Design a protein with these regions (language model features):
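Catalytic cores of DNA base-excision repair glycosylases
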Residues: 2-184, 190-199, 203, 270-272
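Intrinsically disordered, low-complexity, charged terminal extensions of DNA damage-control enzymes
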Residues: 1-10, 15, 175-343
Length: 343
């Protein structure tokens, strides 16, 4: 542990002995770079310094703070879990790993990280970075159940020394030394017993999985304006983008299908529209698919008809009110497209 004591990263959630803050940081760090997380974490802690402050909050407020961090189900599950802890466990985070692991959004990695760092319990926290280190350290090539069990067993042999620090030291090694496509073995405290380093082939391990091409989904969206305000609608709470606001849009086979856009706006929001012109296209990649969005400028023709918002919440907002609501990144690209078209 000499290496960790000397070279560990100075991160705002470390060395504070607060299970809530440790847990929050690990949730935010899933699939997200540390440098991206730091400002989000700091802003969150300023507004919600305790678990109870999260449990008592409005989800829309949490979602606004999370805006841009992506993987929004993390925020939703963290909120649900905090509410459960507040009602069922008197606001105290369970120190039993089985109970903690049963909370929404908590899996083996987060439970191992929180139990080891916050409660000093000897549980490995194995994410992609630590897996990569151990595959190289043990000279394992293929991602099989047998090899994963070997990694877990190996980690349990020395996790007792300083559980949280062991896990965090491996996180730091994976972040700065034993990277996916580049290694700095001369700096690594594990190198002298690392099988792939001793054989001179660390970058060949583990076997790389060929990335699948992201499927492209076509979407058509309507920019609807009235009295210098634009219409935004709220997605229902299901799905990866649940609870976020957006310009009205719908998945289509052909993203120039103007008839389908008209039909969608009529059936869902009781809006009769005519389409004036195409504003442009936006492409945005999420983790599992790409969005190809065609945006059309639309004009309401039944202006006296009340907007039907019984299915989804809807609002007319001015451009300077956009920052009050949480939008997904693809929608922010649409706002940029609108600004360019109006310039």
């Amino acid at each position: 542990m000499f290496w960790y004591d000397k070279y560990k990263r100075n991160l705002p959630w470390r060395d504070i002995n607060d299970p809530y803050k440790t847990w929050l940081s690990e949730v935010m760090l899933q699939q997200t770079q540390v440098n991206t997380v730091i400002p989000y974490y700091n802003n969150w802690i300023k507004k919600y310094p305790t678990l109870s402050s999260v449990a008592e909050s409005e989800f829309d407020d949490l979602l606004k703070l999370w805006e841009g961090l992506g993987y929004y189900s993390r925020c939703k599950n963290f909120f649900k879990a905090c509410q459960l802890i507040s009602t069922d466990f008197d606001g105290i985070i369970p120190s039993d790993i089985i109970i903690f692991n049963s909370l929404p959004g908590v899996g083996p990695y987060i439970s191992g990280a929180v139990m080891s760092i916050a409660f000093n319990q000897p549980h490995p926290a194995i994410d992609g970075n630590i897996n990569r280190i151990m595959f190289r350290y043990l000279g394992l090539k293929n991602n099989t159940i047998y090899n994963n069990n070997r990694i877990y067993a190996k980690l349990t042999t020395f996790i007792n020394l300083r559980p949280g620090d062991i896990n965090q030291s491996l996180m730091d090694i994976g972040s700065s030394i034993c990277k996916s496509n580049i290694v700095y073995c001369e700096k690594c405290p594990l190198s002298q017993s690392c099988k792939t380093f001793l054989n001179g082939i660390p970058l060949l391990y583990p076997e790389k999985i060929k990335q699948k091409k992201l499927p492209l989904k076509n979407i058509i969206a309507g920019l609807i304006e009235k009295n210098n305000k634009i219409l935004i609608v709220k997605r229902d709470n299901k799905g990866a983008l649940g609870g976020l606001w957006e310009i009205p849009m719908i998945f289509v086979n052909d993203n120039n299908d103007q008839f389908l856009l008209k039909s969608f706006l009529k059936n869902k929001y009781n809006l009769d529209i005519k389409i004036n012109y195409k504003v442009g296209n936006v492409i945005h990649s999420f983790s599992h698919y790409k969005m190809n969005i065609s945006l059309f400028n639309c004009e309401i023709t039944n202006k006296c008809t009340e907007l039907n918002s019984t299915i989804n919440a809807s609002k007319w907002i001015s451009r300077n009110e956009i920052d009050k609501y949480a939008f997904h990144k693809a929608n922010h690209k649409l706002f940029e497209l609108i600004d360019k078209s109006n310039a």
